[in-house]
Amino acid sequence: MTSTTNTMCGSYYRNYNGGHGYGCCGYGGLGCGYGGCGYGCCGYGGLGFGYGGLDCGYGGLGCGYGSFCGCGYRGLDCGYGCGYGYVSHSFCGCGYRCGSGYGSSFGYYY
């Protein structure tokens, strides 16, 4: 994926080599997943939120503790106390204004 627009996951083309996952923040679609974000965070087989639904992780919209995607603990934004995510505001914590979180060595912070 070479698109530089912000998708539901905040996917940027830099994520492909920036440590955010295979195929620019998603193995099978727009979601964060399989190669770097971790399939425990944003899924790996659809629009990319959760194990098979439209939510990050397995707690709710933006959750996913232990993720590499920096998904927020609660809500549709990134947050502290969740994987590499610290402070940012995007749907899934990948790309726009997030990267993998503030002060993280696993990606970028936009």
From Swiss-Prot:
Gene name linked to the record: KRTAP6-3
Subunit architecture: Interacts with hair keratins.
Role, per record: In the hair cortex, hair keratin intermediate filaments are embedded in an interfilamentous matrix, consisting of hair keratin-associated proteins (KRTAP), which are essential for the formation of a rigid and resistant hair shaft through their extensive disulfide bond cross-linking with abundant cysteine residues of hair keratins. The matrix proteins include the high-sulfur and high-glycine-tyrosine keratins.
InterPro entries per record: KAP6
GO biological process, one term: keratinization
Protein name: Keratin-associated protein 6-3
Keyword tags: Keratin, Repeat
Species the sequence originates in: Homo sapiens (Human)
Family according to the record: Belongs to the KRTAP type 6 family.
One of the record's GO cellular component terms: intermediate filament
